[in-house]
Amino acid sequence: MASLRSVLKSQSLRHTVRSYSSQTMPPASPFAPRHFLSIADLSPSEFATLVRNASSHKRAIKSGSMPQNLQGSLLGKTVAMIFSKRSTRTRVSTEGAVVQMGGHPMFLGKDDIQLGVNESLYDTSVVISSMVSCIVARVGKHAEVADLAKHSSVPVINALCDSFHPLQAVADFQTIYEAFTPKAHHLSSLGLEGLKIAWVGDANNVLFDMAIAATKMGVDIAVATPKGYEIPPHMLELIKSAGEGVSKPGKLLQTNIPEEAVKDADILVTDTWVSMGQEEEKAQRLKEFDGFQITAELAKRGGAKEGWKFMHCLPRHPEEVSDEVFYSNRSLVFPEAENRLWAAISALEGFVVNKGKIE
C-alpha cells in the first residue's frame, strides 16, 4: 500500500525553506502525537466515525444539549491557528469549534508568522508546539504542514494545503450522510455505498481528499476536467491505494466530457477554477474551462439521477455553477458550509481530546 508520505515524497512535493545551521536534518519529535494531514491518514472506520460524530454533535448542540464528553474538553488548552492563506469558513469554523469546546484559539496570520522565512520550520514547530495543545495549519505547500507535523510535540491538523483539505472532506461526507438515507452498515462504513459523485471542474486539493474518502466509503466518483487538468498520476496512486482492504471500494472515472461524469450521478460537485496562487492563470483557465459550468441543462443532458443534489465548498463564482442550481432546493451548499464547524469539532475531539483514538 502506498503511504501518503512515500507518494508525496516521490513526486517532489517538498520545497526549500530556510536552511538549518547543521547539514543534518533535525530528528522528528520524540513525542510522536498523531496528526491529521489527509483522509489518507485514516482507516475507513475512523473516517466514518469522524463523520458520524460530527453529525451527532451537530444534532445535540443545536438542540441545546452539549455532549458531556465535549463539555470543557479543551478547557485550559490553546489551539494555534497558523494561517498563511486567507480564509473565511476555515477560520470561523475552527475558532468556533475551539471556543465551544472551552479552549482558546490563537490566530497567527501571514503578517504574524511566515513559515520558513525568518525562522526554520523546525524551530517554529518545536517552539510553538511547546506552548499550545494543537496546531491547525492552513498553508501553501504540503511540505510545510508535513514539516510542522514532523517536529511538533502536539497534534497538527491540516486546514488546507495545495494537496489536501481533510476537514472539508469530513464536512462534505457529513453533508452527503445527512442528505441521503444511509443503508444498514458496519462501523467502517457510512451506508452510502452505491452513490455516485460527479466532480466537474478543476482537479484540486478538495477533490483529492474527497476522492480518497469516496474510495474508502464505497462511493463512486467521476471526474470531468479539461485536457491538461486531470488528476496527476501520484494522486491517482494514492486514491487507488485508499481502497486496499475495503470490500467494495468506490470506483474512480476520469473524463474530459462533463456529460460522461454526470451520467447517473446523485451529487454534482464543483469548486473554484482559479485557486489561490493561480491568479495569473485566470484568463487562460476561464477559457479552457468553458463548457464545464454546472447547470440544470448539463444535468439533464448527462442523465443525472432525478433527485440529484449540488455541492460547492465556496467561495463560488458564477462561471462555475448557474444561479438556478446554486440557489435551488437541490443545493446543499449552505448546510455543507455549516458542517465545517461540526467537522472541526469532531476532528479536535478525535485528535486532541482523545489523542488520536477515534471511536
UniProtKB/Swiss-Prot annotation:
Binding residues for carbamoyl phosphate, per the UniProt record?
A: S87, T88, R89, T90, R138, H165, Q168, C313, L314, R340
Which UniProt keywords are given for this protein, alphabetically ordered? Amino-acid biosynthesis, Arginine biosynthesis, Mitochondrion, Transferase, Transit peptide
Pathway(s) it belongs to: Amino-acid biosynthesis; L-arginine biosynthesis; L-arginine from L-ornithine and carbamoyl phosphate: step 1/3
Active-site feature positions: C313 (proton acceptor)
Q: What is its main location?
A: mitochondrion
Give the enzyme's EC designation. 2.1.3.3
Catalyzed reactions per annotation: carbamoyl phosphate + L-ornithine = L-citrulline + phosphate + H(+)
Which example biological process does GO assign this protein? L-arginine biosynthetic process
Task: Give the matching InterPro entries.
Answer: Asp/Orn_carbamoyltranf_P-bd (IPR006132), Asp/Orn_carbamoylTrfase (IPR006130), Asp/Orn_carbamoylTrfase_sf (IPR036901), Asp_carbamoyltransf_Asp/Orn-bd (IPR006131), Orn/put_carbamltrans (IPR002292)
For this chain, the annotated S-S bridges are none
Q: What class of enzyme is it?
A: transferase
Give the location in the cell: Mitochondrion matrix
Tell me which residues bind L-ornithine.
N205, D271, S275, M276
This protein's transit peptide sits at 1-24
Please provide, alphabetically and separated by semicolons, the GO molecular function terms listed in this UniProt record: amino acid binding; ornithine carbamoyltransferase activity
Q: Name one GO cellular component term.
A: mitochondrion
Give the superkingdom in one word. Answer: Eukaryota
Instruction: Provide the assembly information.
Output: Homotrimer.
Q: Which family does it belong to?
A: Belongs to the aspartate/ornithine carbamoyltransferase superfamily. OTCase family.
Q: Which named protein is this?
A: Ornithine carbamoyltransferase, mitochondrial
Please tell me the species this chain comes from: Emericella nidulans (strain FGSC A4 / ATCC 38163 / CBS 112.46 / NRRL 194 / M139)
Name of the coding gene: argB
